[in-house]
Amino acid sequence: MVTIALGSRNPVKINATKEALDVLKLNWDLIGIEVDNGVDKQPFCDQTYVGARNRALNVIRVTNADIGLGIEGGVCNVYGKFIANAVVYVITKEGLENFAISSSFTLPSSMVSLILQGKELGEASDIIFKTNNSKTKEGAIGLLTNNVINRKMLYVQPIVLALYPIYNTMINNTPF
């Protein structure tokens, strides 16, 4: 049995990983453990990649799982607009690495203002929408789209995309 360790205990990230494994028809054991991402509380741009990779590396070290998976949400200024997205990074115990990126979405200026004042995206969302702990539920994307797209949905596709070379290598003996 293959064990995949997620570098988080956030229920949205755990449920998105479970759904991705279901989509891939993989009966792998999943464990979620909180690990350090080594970046700022609110990652910006390249820090998002670094944070996701650090989560994958750190969780595989502490669990000795077959696969370490890190998911990191971040914000970046692109052409004068602030966008949010997530990076999913996977590492096998043999050292194979891959990553994928979620869809990006622009943030309203009210959120950007709070983020630039030092708030995390989830905190900014909670303040603006008068919610609590939205990052463990629908996330900013769910609040902004009235749950047409929620945080779990945003994560499933990049988890699948990050895992496909590992899945193909392990199951189908197809080299990456």
From Swiss-Prot:
Enzyme Commission no: 3.6.1.73
InterPro entries linked: ITPase-like_fam, Non_canon_purine_NTPase, NTPase/PRRC1, YjjX_NTPase
Top-level taxonomic group: Archaea
Cofactor note (record): Binds 1 divalent metal cation per subunit; can use either Mg(2+) or Mn(2+).
Catalytic activity: XTP + H2O = XDP + phosphate + H(+); ITP + H2O = IDP + phosphate + H(+)
Alphabetically ordered keywords of this record: Hydrolase, Magnesium, Manganese, Metal-binding, Nucleotide metabolism, Nucleotide-binding
Gene3D superfamilies: 3.90.950.10
GO biological process: nucleotide metabolic process; thiamine metabolic process
Record carries keyword Metal-binding: yes
Xref: SUPFAM superfamilies: ITPase-like
UniProt key word Metal-binding: yes
GO molecular function: ITPase activity; metal ion binding; nucleotide binding; ribonucleoside triphosphate phosphatase activity
Enzyme class: hydrolase
Entry cofactors: Mg(2+); Mn(2+)
UniProt xrefs under PANTHER family: NON-CANONICAL PURINE NTP PHOSPHATASE_PRRC1 DOMAIN-CONTAINING PROTEIN (PTHR34699:SF2), PTHR34699
Function: Phosphatase that hydrolyzes non-canonical purine nucleotides such as XTP and ITP to their respective diphosphate derivatives. Probably excludes non-canonical purines from DNA/RNA precursor pool, thus preventing their incorporation into DNA/RNA and avoiding chromosomal lesions.
Matches recorded under HAMAP family: Non_canon_purine_NTPase_YjjX
Quaternary structure note: Homodimer.
Family from the record: Belongs to the YjjX NTPase family.
The protein's name in its UniProt record: Probable inosine/xanthosine triphosphatase
